[in-house]
Amino acid sequence: MLIDHVNKSLIYPNLNGGIMLYISNLFDILGRIAFPLFAFFVVEGYFKTKNRTKYLLNLIIFGIISEVPFDMFTSATFFNPRFNNVMFSLALGLITIWIIDVLKTKMSRILWYFISLTIVAVMCLVAMFLAVDYDYHAIIIVYLLYVLYNKPVLSVILGYLSIIKELWAFLGFGFILMYN
């Protein structure tokens, strides 16, 4: 993802054709691979961490620490509230699946699916309101990877379809299939 930010802030603004265009395209492709992997590891972390609260706090703290460099790279300002970094997207995704997981044991399966979709919709609106990176797509991908945790092929296909606008993200989803 760092490669993508370097591309967007240093290479892309200075493009004048030639070899730099190819380098920019390569960096963009490499950057698109990162997000599906981040989303996948949020779900993996949710299931495997000993302390979910600490995990969430680490995402938020790292998001706060990295916001100024992110804003400098993406908008050349110290703070841009209209565009927030991916760590906040991942934190919202974690909060979403945590709420849904807690409710899983408290209601019937059909009601749980309805409620979980409602929670996802609300969290998608929150993501758009907070202007986090990957906005509502982040919430949907984390949710799909969580709900279809034991069906990796289906989760990867639906995850990719939910973010198909990022064409090269399929490479990241391919790496997910190779995990374990």
Walk through the language-model features, giving the residues of each:
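Alpha-helical transmembrane segments and their immediate juxtamembrane cytosolic regions
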Residues: 1-180
